[in-house]
Amino acid sequence: MLNDLKIEELLDKVDSRYGLVVATAKRARQINEYTATLGLNESLGIPGPQVHTRSQHPLTIAIEELRAGKLKVGFREPAREAAEPAGEAPEEQQRAAGEREDQGAA
């Protein structure tokens, strides 16, 4: 089924090649975890394969799910607060650095 696959078909569903790789790899890990914990899946909340396929390879299953429209891909922007160092805001850090320089010059 993947022999006739063209990457352009999948890029219509994802923003970039990088996004395609990340999304299918993450889903393949989920499918792998699903098969490793067969029987406990309901309690763990791990979804099984969403398409009927002859393949047993998690990455192939993930690509087929994306191709069938069963895999929704979205990326979240990192929170601005998480990008800044914990504690002081940038203005406070600059002010503190200036005070340290003043103390060193005295």
UniProtKB/Swiss-Prot annotation:
Q: Where is this region: Disordered?
A: 76-106
The record's catalysed reaction(s) read:
RNA(n) + a ribonucleoside 5'-triphosphate = RNA(n+1) + diphosphate
EC identifiers of the protein: 2.7.7.6
Task: Report whether DNA repair shows up as a keyword of the record.
Answer: no
The GO molecular function terms of this record are:
DNA binding; DNA-directed RNA polymerase activity
GO terms under biological process: DNA-templated transcription
Q: Which UniProt keywords apply?
A: DNA-directed RNA polymerase, Nucleotidyltransferase, Transcription, Transferase
Q: How does it assemble?
A: The RNAP catalytic core consists of 2 alpha, 1 beta, 1 beta' and 1 omega subunit. When a sigma factor is associated with the core the holoenzyme is formed, which can initiate transcription.
Q: What does this protein do?
A: Promotes RNA polymerase assembly. Latches the N- and C-terminal regions of the beta' subunit thereby facilitating its interaction with the beta and alpha subunits.
Q: Which family does it belong to?
A: Belongs to the RNA polymerase subunit omega family.
Query: What's the protein here called?
Result: DNA-directed RNA polymerase subunit omega
